[in-house]
C-alpha cells in the first residue's frame, strides 16, 4: 500500500517478478470505491478536495482534486514470451522505477528532486532517450502548489530533448477526465497512455484556461494537450511516461513504448 501510487507500484513489482523469472504472467492493477461518507468529509476538512468539483490540474485556478471511483488491471508477460505465444500486445514497458522521499514529503507539495531522479532512473533502465518522449501521463492532481513542482521536474528531464529533434512532448492528466482514483490512479493513467499509443492520439486535458504562473513551458518542447493531439506512428518508436505519486512519498514511473506491428497469422480454413 503506497496510497495513490499503489497500482503503478504493483506494475513495477510485476515487471521485477517477470524479469527475475519468478513468474511467467502477472496481473497488476488497482481499485478504488468510496463507500463511506467519512472519506469525503475527512478530505474536505483537510482542504484536499476541490470546492468547485473540477480537477484543474496545472491551471492557475487549481483548487484541489476530485474524488473518483474506478478499477483497472493489465496482464503482463515477458516480451519474448508474448511474441512467441502470438499474444495481442498493446504496448511494451520499456522501463520502470520506484523511489521514496517520505522524510521530506509535504501533503501540499511534492519533492521535485525525487521526481527527477525517478524519471531518470526509469529511463536509464529502459535505455530511453529523453528527446524521444512524445507524451507524459502526469500525476496532475489539481494542487496549486504540487502541480508546478511536477511540471518543473518534467521540464528538467524532458523539456530540452535531443537538439536535433525537438518535437513536442504533450502532457495531460487522466484526473481531469475521470477524477482521482487514489489507489487506482496509476493504473488509470497507464491505461490512458496505452490507449493513446493504440489510437495514435493524445486525449484532451480538461479544465485548463491559464497555466499555473509558478511555471513556464515557453522555453521548452513541452505543452499541455488542451485539445486532442494526433500522435501517428512514425519510423521511430513512440514513448510515453506515466507517473503516480503516493501521499506518503512513494513515487512510481513507467515508460511505455509502441507495441510491435502484429504479424499476420494464417486464418482458419473451413473443412468440408
How would you describe each model-predicted region?
Residues 1-272:
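Condensing-enzyme catalytic core of the thiolase-fold
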Amino acid at each position: 500500500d503506497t496510497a495513490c501510487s499503489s497500482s503503478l507500484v504493483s506494475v513495477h513489482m510485476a515487471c521485477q517478478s517477470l524479469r527475475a523469472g519468478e513468474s511467467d504472467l502477472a496481473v497488476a492493477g488497482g481499485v478504488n470505491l468510496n463507500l463511506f461518507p467519512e472519506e469525503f468529509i475527512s478530505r474536505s476538512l483537510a482542504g484536499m478536495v476541490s470546492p468547485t468539483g473540477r480537477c484543474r490540474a496545472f491551471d492557475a485556478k487549481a483548487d484541489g482534486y476530485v474524488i473518483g471511483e474506478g478499477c483497472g488491471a493489465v496482464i503482463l508477460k515477458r516480451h519474448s514470451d508474448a511474441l512467441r505465444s502470438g499474444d495481442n500486445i498493446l504496448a511494451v514497458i520499456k522501463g520502470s522505477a520506484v523511489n521514496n522521499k517520505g522524510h521530506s514529503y509535504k501533503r501540499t507539495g511534492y519533492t521535485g528532486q525525487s521526481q527527477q531522479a525517478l524519471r531518470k532512473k526509469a529511463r536509464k533502465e529502459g535505455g530511453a532517450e529523453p528527446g524521444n518522449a512524445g507524451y507524459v501521463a502526469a500525476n496532475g492532481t489539481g494542487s496549486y502548489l504540487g502541480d508546478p513542482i511536477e511540471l518543473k521536474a518534467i521540464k528538467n528531464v524532458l523539456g530540452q530533448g535531443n537538439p536535433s529533434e525537438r518535437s513536442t512532448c504533450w502532457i495531460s492528466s487522466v484526473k481531469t477526465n475521470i477524477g482521482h482514483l487514489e489507489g487506482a490512479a496509476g493504473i488509470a493513467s497507464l491505461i490512458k497512455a496505452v490507449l493513446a499509443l493504440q489510437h495514435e492520439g493524445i486525449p484532451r486535458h480538461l479544465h485548463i484556461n491559464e497555466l499555473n504562473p509558478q511555471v513556464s513551458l515557453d522555453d521548452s518542447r513541452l505543452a499541455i494537450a488542451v485539445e486532442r493531439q494526433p500522435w501517428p506512428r512514425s519510423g521511430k518508436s513512440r514513448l510515453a511516461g506515466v507517473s503516480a505519486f503516493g501521499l506518503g512519498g512513494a513515487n512510481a514511473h513507467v515508460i511505455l513504448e509502441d507495441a510491435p506491428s502484429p504479424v499476420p497469422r494464417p486464418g482458419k480454413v473451413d473443412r468440408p
